Structure formats: structure tokens, C-alpha cells
Amino acid sequence: MNSRLRHWREAATLLLAAGAPARPPRSPLGPFDYELLLLQRSSRSGFAPSAHVFPGGLVEAADFSADWLGLLPASPQCGLGLVRPPPPGSCRAPLFATDRVQLGSPLPGEVAFRICAIRETFEEAGILLLVPGRGPAAGSGPAPPLPAARLPPAAELSEWRRRVQEDPACFLQLCRHLGCVPNIWALQEWSNWLTPVGRTGRGARRYDAAFYLCCLERRPPLTSQDDREVTAFLWSSPPEAIERFKSQEIWFPPPQFYELCRLCNFSSFHELHKFSSDRALEGCERWMPVMLTASDGDIELLPGKKTDEGSFKCIKAWKLLHTQAT
């Protein structure tokens, strides 16, 4: 947790994909054999009210607690693979490149941000992404859900969920109680988004968010909204989610919209898992969209996108997104 930041706060987000039987598609892209978990934020939320988002939230000091080192493997990076050095002309996202030891935590950022994403997924959706023992889980395929036999009774699990929501440090206590650890090895580094400076100017909420992708063999046995920050949930394939957006059934903030469009390139669950595992070794750069105000709406420009005819489709998509949101 970086307390030195003044203009934004660090966060972690999880794109949770679960294998599912392919069914007749709602979009021309054909059938997809996996679904993504989407959560609807409360209409009272101070950030993106009523939007559908991926699970995630702010990093807490408990996510960087040295006590995690007593549960996780003692190997470097707790057994996570090493990211290759960035090519010339690019750099590792500051979120990951920051030396956390200098900030008072012996836990690497790559570990703590994954713990945050897993904790928030439990708080918001009731899903526990854990593995028995000290991990990592055996095998290289999509991760299996935690066996139901390892879960406490529903009432006890609900009480643990409430406790973690009230005090993030209770998540480590829950892991000890269950004899499990967060399945950080199932989360692949995917992207890094920094909230742009919006029309409200200085003082608006901004987040530097690490986005991870996790592939599960199948849907977890239990999924439920917390009826606090989250009022509903939806499992949907990427193209179906985009179709729902186009028909204005649901609305996505720009990063979610972009990532869903990106996932539309993968109709095969196992191809997505392989790509994400291989691609994670490359790391990622921080992206901060730049706001462009037009006469009929707002546009968010991404790195590498120019305001010429060749990029018109991209700009039109973002313009449509903001026009519908305002």
C-alpha cells in the first residue's frame, strides 16, 4: 500500500472467467465456451453508480501484511513467475515497479495486489479463490474452484464475509481457519488502468488499478451480491455483454468496455487461458486515457490511437459509451 500517493489510490480488479457449455449466441461472433462475472454497483455508489464492473476494489494495508509470508511459499515472489524486462522504449507499470520494501512492506506488490483482488471478489461476490495448503495448485490448466467440502456452512461463511468487509485483516484469519491460501498463481497480470482527469477536475476520485485475469474450470458453487456495494451479478460471455450494452440494458465504464471488446478475440476458453498465461510474462504498461471533449459528447483516447479516419471506429465506440452514460 503506497501512502505517498496524493492524486489517486491503488486498486486491484479481477476478470473472472469460468468455463461453460457453449449456447446459441446473441451476437454474430458465434458461441463462446466461457462466461465472465459482472457485478452491478449500487446506485448510491460515489464512483460509477449502477455500472456493471468486474470484482475489485481498493488495496488495504492488510493486503501487504508481513503475516502473509507465514502462509505463502518462501520461494522468490511466493512462487509467481518472473516478468521479462520491458523492451526498449517502454517501462514496467509503476504500480508493479515500485519497491514495496522502501514503503515498509516485505510482501511484493505482485503478491499483495493479487490478494486484494481475491479478497474483494469474496467481499463483493461471495467467491473464495483459495487453494488448500500453502499452494501453488498442481497443474497448468484452468484453476478448479475450492471444493465445497472445504467451505464452512453457509451461515458461518456469511459471517466471515461480513467480518472481512468490516476489517480486511480478517481475510488472513479466514485463510488460516480454512487451512488455505489465496490462489495468487491463478491470477494472470492483464492490464493497468489509471483513471483520467475528468471534467470535474481536481478532487475527483482516481484509481491506479491492476487488472488480473483468472480462468476457472467452471462456475464457483456459490455466487451472491453483498447488497451493499453490489446489488446484482451476471455471468455472461464477452459478446453477449457487449450486446447488452448496445441495447442499453447495462452500462460499462470505459476500461470494462475495452477489456470486454478485447476478450471478444477469444471464443475458446482454453485459448484464452493459454494466451493469458503466456502474455502475463510480458508484463504491462500503465494506460491513462486522455479526455477529448467534442460538440456532441466526450471521447477517451488511448495510447497509440490517433484522431484520424483510420481510428474512427475506436473513437466512435468510446464516444458512444460516454454519450449513453451522460
Which residues make up each language-model segment?
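N-terminal leader/linker segments that precede catalytic domains of diphosphate-processing enzymes
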Residues: 1-326
